[in-house]
UniProtKB/Swiss-Prot annotation:
Involved in biotin uptake. It is a multi-pass membrane protein. It comes from the Bacteria. One of its GO terms (molecular function) is biotin transmembrane transporter activity. This is Biotin transporter BioY. It holds the Pfam family BioY. Disruption phenotype: Mutant exhibits lower biotin uptake and has a diminished capacity to form nodules on bean plants. GO terms for cellular component: plasma membrane. The chain crosses the membrane at residues 10-30, 53-73, 78-98, 120-140, 152-172. Its main location: membrane. Part of a biotin transporter complex composed of BioM, BioN and BioY.
Amino acid sequence: MSTRDLVLTALFAAIIVALGLLPPISLGFIPVPITAQSLGVMMAGVVLGARRGAIAVLIVLLLVAIGLPVLSGGRGGLAIFASPTAGFLVGWIFGAFVTGYLSERLVNHGQSGLVQTVSFFLAAMIGGIVVLYAFGITYLATVAGLGFTKAFVGSMAFIPGDVIKAVVAALLGRAVMVGYPLLPARA
């Protein structure tokens, strides 16, 4: 990794941590609040690509593991990885990787702005929602003993917010391509 890669990776790890400072939104009818940190995961994949995006998420999870309160609500420590929602944290790594991988394959400089934005959106939807939820729901169903159907239905309340996050990540990805053409290729 070059110095630029290290700086960009650390920057996006810091962005994910900073998004954890935003207060979580409680809906009342579900016990788990909506947080902004999954937006950071999508943004890391879209802007940095598969490898650097996944590394940025790994840095955040390492900070969590050593006990720093960098998750939404000031949470941190190894106990987080034993909670029923730990599958979503593990899913962040793969979500950022898949989002980045798809962004690298679907988006190029020769496309129109609309095609680039839609491609970034699809990458964020697949990596940041489908992959993330596959890990999170499977782990939640297993650890909490809910069964897959209950865990799946309970998680659907988060989909509208995550779609909005995917739109924001797509718009950011397009803005970075236009505004910073010298940013190293996503890899």
